[in-house]
Amino acid sequence: MTFPSNAHTHSRWCDGANAIPAMVEAARALGFVSLGFSGHAWQGFDPDYSMAPDVQAGYFAELRALQAAPEPGFPRLWAGLELDALAHPDCRRAACAEADYLIGSAHYLCESYGGTSVAVDGDPVLLRRYVDEVYHGDGLAMACDYFAIEVNALLRDRPQIIGHFDLLRKYAASLSLFDEADPAYRRLALSALERAFPCGGVLEINTGGMARGYLTTPYPTLELLCAWRELGG
């Protein structure tokens, strides 16, 4: 017996394509028992990628209204947030206070480089330039910093869900940042996973990179998923 559900869902309130009611109806038609929305929480520096405070307030208002008037046969709704590792302290406090649950994710390497934030899943041209100029082209050094940012945030925030753990793989091949099969990278990723384990969150299997044609395997890799299982996750 299965219990169809999803906890990592984006709507038009942030970078999703559809309105919340339409997504709830689609989930009902698919037989979902629950549906969690996880809009990108305001992180304090990038309004193009996250919900500004007033938008975040509207997001919660819509979800709370739907939660207050559940319809028979529709999935149970959860009002969550995806909190970035570099979110400012006041943004983290607000997210913890407002959300039913948190997805802890690392998107950014820095919040401002020449006036623009640099995300591992953002502008590939900017990411390549950042790696060349800051890391002298060393993608493994970038990966080391990325995982440090991610692990530190997971242990600090202790989210209920760990989002796309190895998101930095998105452009690894197309930008020649590093080779996923390189033992040095694999050791780096595995070490980060082991350090993150005490945060207590559920490690999600995220197929976003596959759905958009960037990858042929999910986040995280099968190797990391098996390692997580062996750790007790």
Residue ranges and their predicted role:
Residues 47, 90, 215-216:
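Short, well-ordered secondary-structure micro-motifs
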Residues 56-198:
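Extended substrate/RNA-proximal surfaces in nucleic-acid metabolism proteins
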Residues 183-233:
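Active-site-adjacent C-terminal substructures of enzyme catalytic domains
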Residues 1-85, 94-96, 100, 169-184, ...:
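An N-terminally biased module of ancient metal coordination in phosphate/nucleic-acid-related enzymes
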Residues 40, 165, 231-233:
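Short acidic/histidine-rich active-site segments
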